[in-house]
Structures are given as structure tokens and as C-alpha cells.
Amino acid sequence: MIAAMGQHGHDPIAQFIRWLDDARRLRIPNYEAMALATAARGGKTSVRFVLLKGIDERGLVFFTDARSRKGRELHGNPRASLAFYWQGKGRQVRVEGSVEEVTPAEADAYWPTRPRQSQLAASASHQSARLRSREEVLARFARLARILKGRRSPSPGVLDRVSRAS
């Protein structure tokens, strides 16, 4: 309802970018966090928080593990809803639409920008999978860290998928 509020014309994307920039400038914690709602083919819904990683002419960009529940749901039903809320500003933005993967080259370009710890964590765990124990994942993480000895983890390929919602 941005346009209905008379905020800066009738371009909701431009208004969203202004509000996002305001939240960043005001150092609102987790200003880039968004609730992502997906639905399985049968209609069962789920929601979780992910981070906005960019905005381009095709939409909003976020990254996820293709094997996770959200990755599987987006593959089977490529529609989603997103919601941002900036506490203290009384602002929220809701986005609904289709989701698509970007090219493998775009996904590969993102991987090296992730902090090393995040790379290791993504490679050591299978998001949304049941764990036998926390120690199991910590052991995998430590083993990868030893093997790579300070180098960045190579992109695991299928582990990370870049999705766009528009």
C-alpha cells in the first residue's frame, strides 16, 4: 500500500529501496532480514527468515540451499511471499510473486563473497536435514577447516541456489 500512502510517487520498488536504505542508515538490526513464505505442491505452507542479498531488474535476490525444505518447495512451486519489518520505523513491505533461479555463473560469483565460516558451515551441513548430534556437524566443520587450512571452501554447487522473487 505504499502508493496509497502517497509516499514518493507511485513506484513501489523505488519506495522499497528508499525504506531499505533508511533502515541500513539508521542501523536497524537485521534490516535485510525478510520472512520468506513458501508452499509445497499440496499447499502446506512454511515460513522462515532469509537475508536479502540484492535487488536488480528481475527482482529481489536471496540465497538458499537447494536441498533444504525451502529449496525443494520453491523447485516444486516457484511462488513465494516475502515480508520485511523495520521495528521502530513502523514500516513493513510485503512482496508476492514468482521465484526463479539465476544462472550457475551468477551463483558461483556469489560464493566467494560469503565469509569463510559461512562457506564451511554450508559445506559441512545439509540444511533442514535431521542431525544425529550437534557434535557430528561440528566434527565435519572442523575436518573441513583442517583440510582447507585457511583457504576458502570451493563452491559446493548444488548446495547454494540463488533465487529471485519478483
Language-model regions, residue ranges each:
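Binding-site signature for planar aromatic cofactors or substrates
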Residues: 1-166
